[in-house]
């Protein structure tokens, strides 16, 4: 019997770079477990004289990503009959590779990435992370490229901003957009649409908490793809016999 396929989050063997494997402790503020193939932010572990690696949490945006978690040497992951995938909860240690480690890490891929394998696309094709569907995608597919849209209201509750438009915006969850001109300025920036409750509303997480509802409305515009592109390449694509994680 012969089987060929990747497993999400299990880095491929590489004797030259395997010593770049890092370990950290999942942040106490993390409310969802981590697993292999998740982008993470790396935080300074306080001033302890004997820290057990960095503090790790799920990345909230492109600028936040330091690397990707892996299952390699992470033997403490929790499994249950309902969840055979090893999970790493708050306070547990987890393995990860930083960008620049030159490790090959299988990640869940979007249809846009899989399509690259059928048209001889360059390995340098710009890639972005889909924070809603937890998968790698192309920057061209992830970034909004439509006409400018004006907001009619923006509010902030529980760490999430809700924007309202006067007409149907056509946005989908996972799409990157640029918001500009809003006051407070904390509402502005390149952000990810996290949900679309109605045709005229959507939610996103600002980089910092605004002081209140928007007193001056903003404009939703196209993103600069360089602002959402990851420092990563597609080395190979496998479709049909690989294992990915669903949560």
Language-model segments: residues:
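Small/polar beta-strand repeat architecture
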Residues: 146-176, 180-227
